Structures are given as structure tokens and as C-alpha cells.
């Protein structure tokens, strides 16, 4: 074969791939579409459309949709993208609970499992967890497509290569590797910071998000960044982890061993008085009790300072989630935004601060998206 023939063959293959990707992308974004509509929208020949539809349906990537009315009187077959032809599983491990969530390629949960399983850094725990994951995955594959992999959302920090938990004081898993955690899991596996995983789901709930600082005000606060509509992790897999930014030099001790961290001041654990719970604090706050209002003001000031500091570097919108967010109403959020604005020299003309739409499954869903997002990118990424 001459060089010219090789070039022609390569060009034809690229064209075929582009046509296939264009059809997949159109069906995934427009729902049920007929061949005729694909022909009109994509400006492709009917034989090209028909051949691709046949191949994609054979591969399970698309499926027949409902019959639709046509001008000729005979109903036309429509086609749709099949988001469950591949699946992925996300896992969260906390002190007493193991949570699994399987998602399709569009990030929708297709099955969940929550089990009481007290964490222990032992092979017995990891093997028991692995057995639960393998059984769960087998059930998913019976009803849907193959599982691409299993991703673990970890509170704390992970190594730059994504294989080791480098800090986790909530379960004591610091230093544990992915090989230990997933020692009996029969699928590809990954680690991700839980805050980063939850942030990934923010883009599912709000497709308009472009740049955002995600701040999760749990008892152990954490953060993550969304840039250009996607999670931004950076080369060290810790971008957005603002919880250990120094807020007050030489201030309160933090659980990381340093002093003055944002986490030490912005945790909702700072709100209750002795022997009072966090829900109890907000219940009394609603009644207008003076000392509770003072504590709330101090806490909001510290949260606002943390946000204003971060926005000096990344002038983005802000999403507030976590346990504390469950008790914050519209007035609290508006108040917090005013405090941030008052602390900011510039960058508040176009600035939105809102509550997260995450829920108890968001960490697992976002973790699973580590497998589904790259698969979808490869499925319809334009050729270069």
C-alpha cells in the first residue's frame, strides 16, 4: 500500500469515527431521535446513519426508543442513547457505615446499598467490604452493563499518585493503600478525596456551573474546585483542599497537628455550648437566644474570611454544603454573602453564593464518575 493509500485509509477511518461520535453525542443530548432527524441535524447520508445505528445498537450503546409520527403516515422508529450499557460503583467508608452506589453513564444512581459496618483497619474488614462490593457489582451486571470500576471516596487527603491515604483522622486510615483497601475487589479501583467526589456531582445538579469553590462545612470541613465545568484536582490531587489554609496564625489547634487552620474555626463543632448538639444549637438559635447569636456571628465571620481569602486567588462562585448547610436558610446565605463582599476588595460584581444540592449518596456518585466521565469522553470525544 502506498503512502497516499495509507493516508486515504486513515482519513476514512477518522471520518467514520467522527460520524459515530456525532451520532452518539446527538442521541445522548437530544433523547429519542429518528434516522431522518439524525440525517437532517447531522447532514449525513441515510446509509451512513443506518450503518452506524445498526453497529451502535449491536454494541448496546444505543437502544430503540418509541415509535414517532411521521409525515408519511407510517410511524418511524426513534433511537436513544443507552446510558446503562456501562456502569460504575462509588464507595464511602465512615466510622460505622459502608455506602455503595452504582451509576449509569449520565451519573444517575441505578442502585444503592447502605450497610452498618464499623470501620477497622484490618484485612478482615477490607475482605468483608470487598465481598459486599463484588456481590453488589454482580447484581448490577445482571440488570445493566459491565461495571467499569470501583472508586473509593476518602475523607482527608490522598497521595499525588492516587494510591495512598496520606491523611484521614476520621477513621484512622492514614497510610493505607488502595491495594489494601480493595484487596478482594475484582474490578479496577481508584481513590478520590470525598470533597472532590461530592463536588463532581454539583455539575450534575447544575449544568451552568463554570468555576466554583465548593466548601463542605462538616465537622471536618473540606473543599474542592470546579474549573470550566469540571473538577480540578491538580497534579497533587488536592486542589481546593482549603480546610488547612491558615486562617488565624498561631490560633486554635487543628486535628492536623497545626494551629490556626480554617478547619479549626469553620467546623460546626464550634457552635454548640458544652453538652449541646449541633441540631440543639440551631434550635435554640431560632428562638433568638443572645449567646447563640453571638457564637453564630463569630462562626459566620470565620467562614466569610476563609471564602474571601480563597476568592483572592480564584475569583469564583461559592457552593456551601456539609452538615452545617442543612441548618442554613436563605437569610443565612444572603448574610454570609454580604460578609464575604465586605471583606473583598474586588471581584464581587458577578458573585453567587448558594447551598449545595448534594445528598448522602453524592460522595459515592462522584467517586463513580471517575470511571464514567473518561469513558464518555472517549466515546464521543472529537478526533484531532
Residue locations for each model-derived region?
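Glycine-rich phosphate-binding/hydrolytic loop that grips phosphoryl groups
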Residues: 5, 12, 17, 25-28, ...
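Glycine/GP-enriched mid-protein hinge/lid loop-to-helix segment characteristic of carbohydrate kinases
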Residues: 112-114, 121, 183-291
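Nucleotide/phosphate-binding catalytic cleft detector across ATP-hydrolyzing
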Residues: 1-75, 79, 379-384
Amino acid at each position: 500500500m502506498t503512502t497516499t493509500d495509507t493516508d486515504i485509509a486513515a482519513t476514512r477511518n477518522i471520518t467514520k469515527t467522527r460520524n459515530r461520535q456525532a451520532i452518539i453525542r446527538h442521541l445522548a443530548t437530544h433523547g429519542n431521535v429518528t434516522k431522518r432527524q439524525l440525517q437532517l441535524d447531522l447532514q449525513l447520508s441515510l446509509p451512513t446513519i443506518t450503518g452506524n445505528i445498526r453497529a451502535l445498537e449491536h454494541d448496546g450503546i444505543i437502544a430503540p426508543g418509541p415509535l414517532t409520527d411521521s409525515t408519511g403516515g407510517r410511524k418511524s422508529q426513534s433511537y436513544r442513547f443507552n446510558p446503562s450499557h456501562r456502569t460504575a460503583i462509588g464507595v464511602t467508608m465512615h466510622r460505622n457505615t459502608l455506602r455503595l452506589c452504582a451509576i449509569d453513564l449520565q451519573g444517575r444512581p441505578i442502585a444503592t446499598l447502605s450497610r452498618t459496618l464499623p470501620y477497622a483497619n484490618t484485612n478482615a474488614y477490607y475482605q468483608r467490604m470487598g465481598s459486599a462490593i463484588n456481590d453488589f457489582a454482580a447484581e448490577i451486571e445482571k440488570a445493566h452493563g459491565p461495571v467499569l470500576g470501583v472508586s473509593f471516596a476518602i475523607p482527608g487527603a490522598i497521595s499525588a499518585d492516587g494510591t495512598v491515604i496520606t491523611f484521614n483522622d476520621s477513621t484512622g486510615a492514614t497510610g493505607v493503600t488502595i491495594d489494601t483497601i480493595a484487596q478482594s475487589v475484582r474490578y479496577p479501583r481508584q481513590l478520590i478525596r470525598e470533597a472532590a467526589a461530592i463536588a463532581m456531582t454539583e455539575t450534575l445538579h447544575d449544568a451552568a456551573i463554570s468555576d466554583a469553590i465548593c466548601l463542605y462545612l462538616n465537622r471536618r470541613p473540606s473543599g474542592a474546585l470546579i474549573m470550566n465545568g469540571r473538577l480540578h484536582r491538580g497534579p497533587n490531587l488536592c486542589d481546593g483542599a482549603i480546610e488547612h489554609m491558615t486562617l488565624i496564625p498561631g490560633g486554635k489547634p487543628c486535628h492536623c497537628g497545626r494551629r490556626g487552620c480554617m478547619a479549626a474555626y469553620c467546623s460546626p463543632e464550634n457552635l454548640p455550648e458544652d453538652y449541646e448538639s449541633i441540631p440543639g444549637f440551631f434550635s435554640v438559635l431560632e428562638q433568638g437566644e443572645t449567646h447563640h447569636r453571638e457564637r453564630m456571628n463569630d462562626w459566620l465571620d470565620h467562614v466569610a474570611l476563609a471564602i474571601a481569602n480563597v476568592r483572592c486567588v480564584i475569583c469564583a462562585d461559592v457552593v456551601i454544603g456539609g452538615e452545617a448547610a442543612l441548618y442554613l436558610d436563605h437569610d443565612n446565605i444572603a448574610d454570609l454573602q454580604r460578609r464575604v463582599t465586605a471583606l473583598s476588595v474586588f471581584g464581587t460584581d458577578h458573585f453567587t453564593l448558594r447551598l449545595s444540592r448534594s445528598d448522602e449518596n453524592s460522595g459515592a456518585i462522584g467517586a463513580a464518575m471517575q470511571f464514567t466521565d473518561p469513558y464518555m469522553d472517549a466515546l464521543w470525544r472529537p478526533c484531532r
